[in-house]
């Protein structure tokens, strides 16, 4: 079976969804920009040699509809002979895109693929056109479709206090801002055209969603956002709304060597699981455990974790049940996470994987794990190994 390697991984800056940098930039353009950039950064691979493009996107309507993967590829002037497919596993869509490409390569049906994902939550809101089947309430609590309430449920079940959530959210912003200031994101962010507050076209090379002024004291003043009477989850401890895309060049190890391209990491194992929709945010725990089992590893073998921060109330129970509470500052989301950077749904899986690869290199660790919860009760995880 072929070894699957990541040759390159990049992302756009994360733009604020409400009147932000990409308010006049379409999702297809964000995607095409990264496709072009990956090919330009790796000229040894001819675009015509790509076997497929797998692109995650959740709200597949309006500008994100009608197979955005293909539309973006055409905009990027990828040869018409290269196919493209849009993947939807809600929050895990672009990580699923990676898994789909990896399996094609493992079986020998592909040698080189572009994978990634996008979500423009300013142009196509998360709730746009959502119409749950009324019969679902016979089998699943109606609140299971309300992500904030599932986070409230997890917080109550696991004893996660408001103070713990506020502290974690402040940490996310502080670490993301420190990473920005130190240049830690420089290797992954591709400058992307957008508009500043005055409408002037400019190149953005930083995440505009981060709030460096965030403090625990300020967060403590916010009202609960989803359960106004008994709740502890606020807008400040939830993932920000942002627009962005991320992309990776995935190849068989043999093809990368043929072309003289240096792999950055191998895909060591992959896992996806289901869980109770009412605690959808718990999905990373069984997904991570399954991925570790497939890799023949334990959590202690992992040098760095990237865990998507849907909510502080959601990620903290996952950290606790993976036995990592004492290692948060050494291993988990060292450059902040979605609370600070936002969670553009179809983008985030590739985004956290991209950040993870850079952290693995910077920390000089052998293994890294990226994992996410998924709306309606799923979890997805990938173990990477440095080459």
From Swiss-Prot:
| Localization per Swiss-Prot or TrEMBL | Cytoplasm
Look up the record and name the pathway of this protein: Lipid metabolism; fatty acid beta-oxidation
Q: Name one GO biological process term.
A: fatty acid beta-oxidation
Catalytic-site annotation from UniProt? 91, 343, 373
Q: Which GO terms describe its molecular function?
A: acetyl-CoA C-acyltransferase activity
Q: What is its main location?
A: cytoplasm
- Catalytic activity entry: an acyl-CoA + acetyl-CoA = a 3-oxoacyl-CoA + CoA
Return the similarity comment: Belongs to the thiolase-like superfamily. Thiolase family.
Record-given protein name: 3-ketoacyl-CoA thiolase
Q: Which gene encodes it?
A: fadA
